[in-house]
Amino acid sequence: MLFWNADPILIQLGPIAVHWYGALFATGFLLGYQLMQRIYRQEGRPTEQLDKLLTYIFIGTVVGARLAHTLIYEPEYYLAHPIDILKIWEGGLASHGGGIGVLLAIWLFVRQHPENKFLWLADRLAIPTALTGCFIRLGNFMNSEIIGNSTDGSWGVVFERIDTLPRHPVQLYEAASYFAIFVLLLMLFRTTKSKQTGFLFGLFLTLVFAARFIIEYFKTPQAAYEAGNLISVGQWLSVPFVLAGIVLMLLSAKEKAR
């Protein structure tokens, strides 16, 4: 059993506080950026557009994830304290909203740069996105947020800032799942699967949101109105992503068979 009471602030520089959550988010994003540069170079693509593309994605991720969290999980609080919506370094990003924000960002980028194809980009961006998701969940762990149900298992974590109960470290479950998905996607990208348009993106959607659906059963409700529900809001929101991923993989396989 682990007793956990980490300080959410990584370092204090005078009046400026660098939070673990923000630092881990930035680390994941920067590593993803480096990976995309390598992918572009390996495929003989110019890297000049990457800065613009990833700026769009960063904005889409943060805005989409933050708005989804505030509107779905804590609408009463943020309607009463709207300025707190801007405090993203304190945590509170919903992955479903972030996913939608990323898709909109890619769509907007492709509209402005039609020489790029949506699914070609999505297949490749899926790889660093899984890695970034891993780092974001580690940030949640450092913040002692998105906690799990109580457990009698020896792997339980007591989040001392919350209570004295040993709980499932669901943040670490998700982080490990996303890292495993990242490794799998990276391995498949080095095979002929990278030539099947839409396959890697479809696999990403299916695995990430299937993992999210399963792990939700070990989480405490993130909103009061979820208490007692057999299916959580996060699970309902995951279903369309899983179905979309399966459809993309089937279409990719059908195209390959032609």
Curated annotation (Swiss-Prot):
Chain sites annotated for binding a 1,2-diacyl-sn-glycero-3-phospho-(1'-sn-glycerol): R137
Membrane topology: Multi-pass membrane protein
Known pathway: Protein modification; lipoprotein biosynthesis (diacylglyceryl transfer)
Main location: membrane
GO CC terms of this entry: plasma membrane
Keywords, alphabetical: Cell inner membrane, Cell membrane, Membrane, Transferase, Transmembrane, Transmembrane helix
MF GO annotations: phosphatidylglycerol-prolipoprotein diacylglyceryl transferase activity
Top-tier EC class: transferase
InterPro entries referenced in this protein's UniProt entry, alphabetically: Lgt
Domain of life: Bacteria
Membrane-spanning parts: 9-29, 53-73, 90-110, 117-139, 169-189, 198-218, 230-250
Localization annotation: Cell inner membrane
Catalytic activity, EC: 2.5.1.145
Pfam families linked to this entry: LGT (PF01790)
GO biological process, one term: lipoprotein biosynthetic process
HAMAP family: Lgt
Biological role stated in the UniProt entry: Catalyzes the transfer of the diacylglyceryl group from phosphatidylglycerol to the sulfhydryl group of the N-terminal cysteine of a prolipoprotein, the first step in the formation of mature lipoproteins.
Family (UniProt): Belongs to the Lgt family.
Identification of the protein by name: Phosphatidylglycerol--prolipoprotein diacylglyceryl transferase
Protein source organism: Tolumonas auensis (strain DSM 9187 / NBRC 110442 / TA 4)
Lineage: Bacteria, Pseudomonadati, Pseudomonadota, Gammaproteobacteria, Aeromonadales
